[in-house]
Regions:
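N-terminal glycine-rich FAD/FM-binding segment characteristic of electron-transfer flavoproteins
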Residues: 1-334
Length: 334
């Protein structure tokens, strides 16, 4: 079989507790864009148990087809049954492109799927485009610690596979009038691949809001001087109903945990308002927040890239300005 025999864009529609993970909708949105360039449809692959009703939601966000594999062995995610089911779908339908979210599940599942279908995988992509010359998929990701961007091709094998970071791509507006063809598939031998028994699922209680969910992000950089000074950023975030984030140097210095990092080697965010306090604006950081609706930068250096990228720039010491701003907003919003 030649690579010309592979057709279509497939996305993994991840669900947990019968709730579709947001990145799944983002993959469909990007998949529609890619599919338009190569003249095909987008198929969402939905695995689980009792999940058939979720097909309409995937259709509303743009899926042209939804392949549903519904089985008791897929009720809770475990590696082998999910990998076996997805490999079976690939072998039957021969998609040209397969997209997974770069979530804990996607990162566990995608490399195993790619190995079993003997193709490559580009992980943590921040950009996907169709090459106008040969219609191949150009997959771009950070390399060398985020210092360069590498564009990777999979010209000799199919499907072309990538994991995509949550928040990088945009989902389409929901349209409940859009319907998809729903195909119910049965995968043989799932029980033979159950080698882990899940006894209990204990969910962690998040102490802070996920930065990708926040409408207002107050982000600090090396210019904040110390981890203790992030308390003033928390105060500002609390006034506005948001949460705090940071640039990579703050994580490298141990000031904040990795899940607070914005940028190419952290998370991509799109809040309504993004405060950049003491952040110079390295290209790696800008790539993770440049699509925020409003960017407000506070920096001593008026020539800092972050000031240039901001909708509103305040030139001055963030350690002095942030407390004043917090008090002013408290009075305004009281």
């Amino acid at each position: 079989m030649s690579i010309q025999d592979y057709k279509g864009v497939f996305t993994f529609a991840q669900q947990v507790d019968n709730e579709i993970t947001p990145v799944s909708f983002e993959l469909i949105g990007k998949g529609k864009e890619l599919a338009a360039d190569i003249g095909c449809d987008v198929t969402a692959v939905l695995l689980g148990h009792g999940v058939a009703d979720l097909a309409d939601e995937l259709a509303a966000y743009g899926a042209d087809r939804v392949i549903v594999v519904d089985a008791p062995e897929l009720e809770v995610y475990t590696t082998e049954p999910y990998v076996h089911a997805f490999v079976d779908i690939i072998n039957k339908y021969k998609p040209e492109i397969c997209l997974f979210g770069a979530t804990a599940i996607g990162r566990d599942m995608a490399p195993r799927v790619s190995a079993r279908v003997h193709t490559g995988l580009t992980a943590d992509c921040t950009k996907l485009e169709i090459n106008p010359d040969d219609k191949g998929l150009m997959m771009t990701r950070p390399a060398f610690g985020g210092n360069i961007m590498a564009t990777i091709l999979c010209s000799e094998h199919r499907p072309q596979m990538s994991t995509v970071r949550p928040g990088v791509m945009q989902k389409l507006p929901r349209d409940d009038s859009h319907k998809a063809e729903v195909i119910n598939e049965t995968v043989d031998g799932l029980a033979d691949h159950v080698n882990v028994e899940v006894l209990e699922v204990v969910k962690a209680v998040a102490e802070k809001m996920n930065i990708q969910d926040a409408k207002v992000l107050v982000s600090g950089g090396r210019g904040m001087g110390s981890p203790e000074n992030f308390k003033m950023l928390e105060d500002l975030a609390d006034v506005l109903g948001g949460t705090i984030a940071c640039s990579r140097p703050c994580v490298d210095n141990g000031w904040l945990p990795k899940d607070r990092q914005v940028g190419q080697t952290g998370q991509t965010v799109r809040p309504n308002v993004y405060f950049a306090c003491g952040i110079s604006g390295a290209i790696q950081h800008l790539a993770g927040m440049e699509e925020s609706d409003i960017i407000i930068a506070i920096n001593k250096d008026e020539s800092a890239p972050m000031i240039a990228a901001a909708d509103y720039g305040i030139v001055g010491d963030a350690l002095k300005i942030v407390p004043l701003l917090t008090e002013a907003l408290k009075k305004e919003l009281a």
